[in-house]
Amino acid sequence: MVTTHNLGFPRIGAKRELKFGLERYWKGESSRDELKALGAELRRRHWHDQRDLDLAPIGDFAFYDQVLDMSFTLGNLPKRVQDFHGDALDNYFRVARGRSAQSAEEHAACCGGVAAGEMTKWFDTNYHYIVPEFHADTNFSLDPSRLLQQLAEANAQGVNAKPVILGPVTYLWLGKAKDDSDRLALLPKLLPVYGALLDTLTAQGVEWVQIDEPILVTELDAEWRQAFRIAYAALETRRIKLLLATYFGQLQDNLTLAASLPVDGLHIDAINARDEVDALVRELPAERVLSVGAINGRNIWKTDLNAALDWLEPLAKQLGDRLWLAPSCSLLHVPVDLASEEKLDAEIRSWLAFALQKLDELKVLATALNEGRDKVADALAANAAAIDSRRRSPRVNNPAVKAAIARIDARLGNRTSPYTQRASKQSARLNLPAFPTTTIGSFPQTAEIRQARSRFKAGALDEAGYRKAMQAEIERSVREQESLELDVLVHGEAERNDMVEYFGEQLDGYAFSQFGWVQSYGSRCVKPPILFGDISRPKAMTVEWIAYAQSLTRKPMKGMLTGPVTILNWSFVRDDQPRAVSCYQLALAIREEVLDLEKAGVRVIQIDEAALREGLPLRRAQWSEYLKWAVESFRITANGVQDDTQIHTHMCYSEFNDIIASIADMDADVITIETSRSDMELLDAFDTFKYPNEIGPGVYDIHSPNIPTQDHIVGLMRKAAERIPAERLWVNPDCGLKTRQWAEVIPALTNMVAAAKMLRNQVQ
């Protein structure tokens, strides 16, 4: 019999209950006990949703991040919070979010009382994790309370529980040494704590533990490979069964290593590594379980179940009880329930599967393998009809778009003149001071903005009323920026629900959901639009709003667009053509918007590519192909304008030291980047690479409520000036200010502008 299980379930709730619960708690509007009760209720509901599985995950629920949870389980707390003796949950949030100082003395140590932990992308997804911090003298100590609490809840509910933990080698690999120490040198101290954790779970009657080691799908040197052998030899003596889980890619040169580790089962991502199944069957010891991720855990398209059974049936005959079935990875990366999508186009809806529907697909596959296809004939027929409908739909294929793609040539991606000539023309037109100040685009999405949007969508506010409300918010943003004496202004994006969904709603070839939310980090959720067909732009999307904002001020107003690579990487993308083709289609559509903004008199146009690095394949050998079409797509978008129109781009969480040449090749006049959480570490790339254009290193972390001091910002900019000529530096926050409150934004930007003025005086 085939065993079914799941690697993880979305934790936010079908209606984002966790997000709203967290925000109430952080604002002091609910108690700690109420938040913990909400967590328990979500876990209860999610285990009920997974009741048909043979094994359901526990430990996948986190109030902020599963990697941060593992740090607390291992007793690896940053030194700056180790002396805090209050509630563990509050300490947890101190690491996740930081805490502003209450006094000048606290400010002296940092930009606030407690600095937030560094946050970065979880492999090549749009989820972010809190980076574990290590020092040469780091010690570990077991705190299993979180897992034991969830295990007790699951047992009481009758769940056949499979605890999920992050493996020791991946945990070290994901972290960062805060001194010059070697992370792997900590492995001997870490392994006994893992052993104690497994012993603790064994004592609770747990049979299987899922231990995630996704770095096995990346390129590993000999030292890291040896770390796997050492780690699992040490854990082999435990009496508990280990399912080693890999996902997000192929094992490739790590296949033999993964197959040889002394564990009881191996999970692979059979969406990406389907070609490796036969080799694994040959290499795995005869008694070992092979779990195949046959349902895509990262996209929302229905699985072709009949096609999946065509290759699973021979495998089931070969492996028998040793075959397990699961999604390819945790379902954290997809929305919860398609059944909520009552307003989604019925035809498009028939092509989709969210987390609950993927579990239904898993059940159909397992039933067909265990009892024969006839047992689920109706479900298989319905699935086949949906797959065929999508394949044949004229809504998916637009001949005019395909013809435009065929006409793309190199000239489309080139500016008229090189940067040095453009810079002088832009300087004359914009007349900006040294260290010009700007923000990245969005200002706080206030309750009034959200209420107006909600009323408009519900039909309670007409279009004229909605436009008036948004114009009032735009005017407020402009007046605040003028009062702050910022140099290049933004309109604040009051009218935008999301930097990608806003555009997806206005492009042909896109559909959008009501409740298709996925977690990005903490309480931050995004609702990726659904790219189902060929992309085109029926009409201008932003010109009216930007032109109105520009009419309110004589200062330059940035046109704000999301770039094609980011729209692609933050969408649920069609899987029936190469991603590069979809990206070129987006580039042509956004290019039309860029040219319309320029015609409307907009002098500065920002094209955000926040997710450029996110699309990089996990293996470096595959980078060049991705970067080629990603950079080409940006250049097609940006390079139709005149020399005196200044093109900006923004990248967040982009550890781009290793792709700096490609970023330079994008040829944006100004790039703004996230650097504050890494203390300008991202600028190390400029020690050896002479970036030719202008750059704005982010000077304060907008993901934390901390208010940076003027001196702190000046210090960061001085570090930047050691690498970038002062005349090419801008001063700006790390990212957009949408998630902050005006009470936080005004003092932070006041200090930022004051810092820029101080720098100008020092330069003069």
Swiss-Prot record:
Q: How the cofactor binds, per note?
A: Binds 1 zinc ion per subunit.
Q: Where does 5-methyltetrahydropteroyltri-L-glutamate bind?
A: R16, E17, L18, K19, K121, R524, C525, W570, E614
- List the cofactors: Zn(2+)
Task: Please list the GO biological process terms of this entry.
Answer: methionine biosynthetic process; methylation
This protein's source sits in the domain of life called: Bacteria
The molecular function GO annotations come to:
5-methyltetrahydropteroyltriglutamate-homocysteine S-methyltransferase activity; zinc ion binding
Q: In which pathway does it act?
A: Amino-acid biosynthesis; L-methionine biosynthesis via de novo pathway; L-methionine from L-homocysteine (MetE route): step 1/1
Active-site feature positions: H703
Residues binding L-methionine: I440, G441, S442, E493, D608
Q: Which UniProt keywords apply?
A: Amino-acid biosynthesis, Metal-binding, Methionine biosynthesis, Methyltransferase, Repeat, Transferase, Zinc
The coiled-coil segments of this chain are none
Tell me which InterPro entries the record gives.
Cbl-indep_Met_Synth_N, Cobalamin-indep_Met_synthase, Met_Synth_C/arc, UROD/MetE-like_sf
The EC number on file is 2.1.1.14
The residues that hold L-homocysteine are I440, G441, S442, E493, D608
Pfam families xrefs: Meth_synt_1 (PF08267), Meth_synt_2 (PF01717)
Cysteine pairings via disulfide bonds: none
Q: What catalytic activity is recorded?
A: 5-methyltetrahydropteroyltri-L-glutamate + L-homocysteine = tetrahydropteroyltri-L-glutamate + L-methionine
Record function comment: Catalyzes the transfer of a methyl group from 5-methyltetrahydrofolate to homocysteine resulting in methionine formation.
Name the PANTHER family on file.
5-METHYLTETRAHYDROPTEROYLTRIGLUTAMATE--HOMOCYSTEINE METHYLTRANSFERASE
Name of the molecule in the record: 5-methyltetrahydropteroyltriglutamate--homocysteine methyltransferase
